[in-house]
Swiss-Prot record:
Pathway: Porphyrin-containing compound metabolism; protoporphyrin-IX biosynthesis; coproporphyrinogen-III from 5-aminolevulinate: step 4/4. The record marks 77 as: Transition state stabilizer. This is Uroporphyrinogen decarboxylase. The keyword Lyase applies. Its EC number is 4.1.1.37. It is found in: Cytoplasm. The gene is hemE. Homodimer. GO terms for cellular component: cytosol. Gene3D superfamilies: 3.20.20.210. It holds the Pfam family URO-D. Catalyzes the decarboxylation of four acetate groups of uroporphyrinogen-III to yield coproporphyrinogen-III. It comes from Aeromonas salmonicida (strain A449). Belongs to the uroporphyrinogen decarboxylase family. InterPro entries: UROD/MetE-like_sf (IPR038071), Uroporphyrinogen_deCO2ase_HemE (IPR006361), Uroporphyrinogen_deCOase (IPR000257).
Length: 355
């Protein structure tokens, strides 16, 4: 294995010394970049882009050519797992993801296969191997999956949702059906992430985008429990290094202590929580990733720098901070503003890391 030229991101996740705060952006390979749009046009559509290892590699590397980012993240989608289970993923123009065969009953859940990550999801592993090769040890590669709860919301609702009525109906009227679905999804995600690690991912992240729509008790029983199972089932050492695991529940700021108790290495934070408060609560147990509002990138460059400075000061001195947005970058952001953000993190953070 090539030694990493820049391991700042991995070191920060393990709360080890770094010379400056590492930074990457959720959805850093995406529609805000004109070069991404050009590559997607070549692919034809989103899933064709995901399924072509060379093109998925190209869009993964595009933001690294523009910005001095400290990590690359696999270009893929959280819905690859339910798609591999046979639900028939497709994308409606302007509507987002849909499933041809949503989950409606216990029989549907019982019939679901657990996908073989090197078979039905082999195209993802090919992308991981291709990206890892082309990175040439410059920065680490992040693999990822959706959380069981978040994947289940799409599978039961049949796509995106605002009210989550179908899955909440299942949760309250047929909890055993939902628990079986979540358990199968947890097993699928463990296999999927471990295959990504074996293929070359040096860190993994679980996106629990919709955990924040649950009551505290339901969050514990229907989301956190299954993320805990995933953390317990993951490969944590590979290529002579620890493989850090980050859990991110959007709107999950009230549950940081419980998430930190899963044994993960880092928590993702959205912008609705003060990072100083998060550090006070769980900074002795886990690293923190975040947490600038992605909409701040619409602001003037001076205002972006000011916000970066505020968040860095909130975390303060010491290790264990990976700077990121609190969610994905918006598609109509000026790429120059993203560059201001990345450069500001490096420039303004060195003072907090004494050498």
């Amino acid at each position: 294995m090539k030694e990493l030229k820049n391991d700042r991101y991995l070191r920060a996740l393990l709360r080890q010394d770094v010379d400056m705060t590492p930074v990457w952006m959720m959805r850093q390979a995406g529609r805000y970049l004109p070069e991404y749009k050009a590559t997607r046009a070549v692919a034809g559509d989103f899933m064709s882009l995901c399924r072509n290892a060379e093109l998925a590699c190209e869009v993964t590397l595009q933001p690294l050519r523009r910005y001095p980012l400290d990590a690359a993240i696999l270009f893929s989608d959280i819905l690859t797992v339910p798609d591999a289970m046979g639900l028939g993923l497709y994308f409606e123009q302007g509507e987002g993801p849909r499933f041809e065969r949503p989950i409606k009953s216990m029989a549907d859940v019982q019939a679901l296969p657990i996908p073989d990550p090197e078979d039905e999801l082999g195209y993802v592993m090919n992308a991981v191997r291709t990206i890892r090769r082309e990175l040439k040890g410059e920065v680490p590669l992040i693999g990822f999956s959706g959380s069981p709860w978040t994947l289940a919301t799409y599978m039961v609702e049949g796509g995106s949702s605002k009210a989550f009525t179908k899955i909440k109906q299942m949760m309250y009227a047929e909890p055993q059906t939902l628990h079986l679905l979540l358990d199968k999804l947890a097993d699928s995600v463990i296999g999927y992430l471990n295959a990504q690690i074996k293929a070359g991912a040096q860190s993994v992240m679980v996106f629990d985008t919709w955990g924040g729509v649950l009551t505290p008790r339901d969050y514990r029983d229907f989301s956190l429990q299954y993320m805990h199972k995933i953390v317990d089932g993951l490969i944590r050492e590979n290529e002579g290094r620890r493989v850090p695991v980050t859990l991110f529940t959007k709107n999950g700021g009230q549950w940081l202590e419980q998430i930190a108790a899963t044994g993960c290495d880092a928590l993702g934070l959205d912008w609705t929580i003060d990072i100083a408060d998060a550090k006070r609560r769980v900074g002795d147990k886990v690293a923190l990733q975040g947490n600038m509002d992605p909409s701040m990138l619409y602001a003037a460059p001076a205002r972006i720098r000011e916000e970066v400075a505020t968040i860095l000061a909130g975390f303060g001195s010491g290790n264990g901070h990976v700077f990121n947005l609190g969610h994905g970058i918006h598609q109509d952001v000026d790429p120059e503003h993203a560059g201001v953000f990345v450069n500001a993190v490096h420039e303004l953070s060195a003072q907090y890391h004494g050498r």
